[in-house]
Amino acid sequence: MKNKKKFVIFAHSGTYDKLYQIVTLAITAASMGRETYIFLFFWALRRFVNEEFDFKRLSSEFGSEGERLAKRMQEINPISLKEILQEVRGMGNLKIYACTAAVKIMELEESLVKSKVDDIL
């Protein structure tokens, strides 16, 4: 990943709508040939490490409106965020990093985090 334009995403929030935006921004930038970096903090880090990308959580995050959206998404049956991320990572120009302090603050197991990201910084 040298001599290419770079695209950096700093992700803090772990709500589905924010995770969706992170993934769509990453796939767009990577598809355009940019070196793409995602830096994970706090709830985004927790959801990523625990692979909690399910849109069904919308109902608990956004009440009745989230329930309606989750039902609609179930009907549409979109490709999962996890699958999209795997595809983007396969392109070779996406790196995902975890914040050292956030790993400790969120009480995440360091070995598990290391197995899900490119590095802990």
Name each region found by the language model:
Residues K4-V8:
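Extreme N-terminal starter segment of soluble prokaryotic enzymes
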Residues I9-Y20, F48-V49:
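Short, glycine-rich nucleotide/cofactor-binding loops
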Residues Y20-M32, I38:
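Histidine-anchored nucleotide/phosphate-binding helix
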Residues F42-R46, A102-V103:
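Short beta-alpha junction loops
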Residues K56-G90:
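A glycine-rich helix N-cap at a beta->alpha junction
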Residues S80-L121:
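A charged, amphipathic interaction segment
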